[in-house]
């Protein structure tokens, strides 16, 4: 037998090769290879190819040797082949990056994607055209609420579909960056076209009708909501510990999610100090007479940092009525929405989404000539750009009023 190629050994009845990988000498037996001159030469060629792949950063241990115990120890990330496996590993990694609330919503979205795409689908088979087909299915197909089948309906909103597809593209981008797939099917996938919805604020006449139809806490709640611009999750989570009636300010540092979990406001800019307009301050002073002396309740606050929670004892500004002898310490976001719908109906004014209390705040301040940067800071937006994007059409409609105001001030 001729001299063995570099890195090739004969061990009993088997041919074995060795190579250096990550600073360690690795040995792999070529099972099923008979000891012949031809196979020894092939083993030398295989070993040379592996060395080349290692040097060029292309070597995938478990692809070359799927059953290797050495490879299983050397490789820290397992090879992912199916969509279900991709969802599992992505979720495990993202749990340390996303807040508990965001993770819950994401897992709910993944349940739907797992059904539509099918868990056993090889991720290497997913093409650009498949993503577009999944998008159509999400847009026109039936919703898949497994916990509450009665709520299922045909179709989803464009915004919801865009969120699902953004999540899917994020998964596939992760798969590409991890070397699980060699193509980029997510490239070029665009958002569906959406019409910009023009804000529909309450008129002063409608607001007065709302105030006349409400009394007590309900009147205080909606008066404060309209004149402070807080998000409804921030309203529900507002505690007297956040309020300074002397200085006329509210420190917004807590939000209640739709999943009934307390955490920071939506963005870092959402943690802010709101300087109260006089009507908002008056509403809080009246509300203090109703709930300012209630006992504190303990809640769990979920920080953005993974795994960090905090117990907080608070007495909330707005509290539900006693029901069946029990007093819940705060409103849920959905119950605030229900109270808004009931109040609008009692007032006999046109129905709007509850979020329009916030739109009304912004539009009224713009009409009064407030600086968009100031409005953005009060509402918890990162920059004034958000105000221009959301209320741009409203601002354009105010041009004539702005000219009249400038003429009056400059004359």
Curated annotation (Swiss-Prot):
Top-level lineage group: Bacteria
Keyword DNA-binding carried by entry: yes
InterPro entries, alphabetized: CB, DNA_brk_join_enz, Integrase-like_cat_sf, Integrase_catalytic, Integrase_recombinase_N, Min27-like_integrase_DNA_bind, Tyrosine_recombinase_XerCD
Gene Ontology MF terms: DNA binding; site-specific recombinase activity
Keyword entries, A-Z: DNA integration, DNA recombination, DNA-binding, Viral genome integration, Virus entry into host cell
Domain Tyr recombinase span(s) in chain numbering: 197-404
Active site: 231, 266, 358, 381, 391 (o-(3'-phospho-dna)-tyrosine intermediate)
GO biological process, one term: symbiont entry into host cell
PANTHER family assigned to the protein according to its UniProt record, in alphabetical order: PHAGE INTEGRASE-RELATED, PROPHAGE INTEGRASE INTR-RELATED
Function per UniProt: Integrase is necessary for integration of the phage into the host genome by site-specific recombination. In conjunction with excisionase, integrase is also necessary for excision of the prophage from the host genome.
Family designation: Belongs to the 'phage' integrase family.
Name of this chain's protein: Prophage integrase IntR
Source organism of this protein record: Escherichia coli (strain K12)
């Amino acid at each position: 037998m001729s001299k063995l190629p570099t890195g090739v050994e004969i061990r009993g009845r088997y041919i074995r090769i060795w190579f250096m990988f990550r600073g360690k000498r690795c040995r792999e037996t070529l099972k099923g290879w008979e000891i012949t001159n031809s196979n020894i030469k092939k083993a030398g060629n295989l070993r040379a190819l592996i060395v080349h792949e290692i040097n060029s950063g292309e070597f995938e241990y478990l692809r070359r040797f799927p059953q290797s115990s050495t490879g299983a120890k050397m490789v820290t990330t397992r090879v992912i082949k199916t969509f279900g496996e991709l969802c599992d590993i992505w979720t495990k990694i993202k749990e340390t990056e996303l807040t508990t609330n965001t993770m819950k919503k994401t897992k709910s979205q993944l349940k739907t994607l797992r059904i539509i795409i099918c868990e056993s689908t090889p991720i290497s088979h997913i093409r650009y055209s498949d993503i577009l087909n999944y998008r159509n299915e999400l847009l026109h197909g039936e919703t898949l609420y497994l916990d509450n089948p009665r709520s299922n309906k045909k179709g989803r909103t464009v915004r919801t579909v865009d969120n699902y597809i953004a999540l899917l593209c994020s998964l596939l981008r992760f798969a590409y960056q991890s070397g699980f797939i060699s193509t980029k099917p997510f490239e070029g996938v665009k958002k569906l076209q959406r019409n910009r919805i023009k804000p529909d604020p309450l008129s002063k006449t409608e607001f007065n009708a709302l105030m006349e139809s409400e009394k007590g806490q309900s009147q205080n709640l909606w008066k404060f909501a309209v004149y402070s611009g807080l998000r409804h999750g921030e309203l529900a989570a507002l505690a007297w510990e956040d309020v300074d009636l002397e200085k006329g300010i509210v420190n917004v540092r807590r939000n209640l999610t739709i999943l009934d979990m307390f955490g920071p406001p939506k963005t870092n800019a959402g943690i802010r100090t709101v300087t109260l307009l006089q009507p908002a301050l008056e509403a809080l002073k009246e509300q203090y007479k109703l709930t300012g002396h209630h006992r504190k309740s303990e809640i769990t606050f979920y920080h953005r940092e993974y795994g960090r929670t905090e117990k907080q004892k608070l007495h909330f500004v707005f509290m539900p009525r006693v029901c069946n002898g029990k007093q819940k310490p705060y409103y849920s976001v959905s119950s605030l929405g229900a109270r808004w719908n009931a109040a609008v109906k009692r007032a006999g004014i046109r129905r709007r989404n509850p979020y329009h209390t916030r739109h009304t705040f912004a539009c009224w301040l713009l009409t009064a000539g407030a600086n968009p940067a100031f409005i953005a800071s009060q509402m918890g937006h990162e920059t004034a750009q958000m105000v221009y994007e959301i209320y741009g059409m409203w601002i354009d409609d105010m041009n004539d009023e702005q000219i009249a105001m400038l003429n009056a001030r400059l004359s």
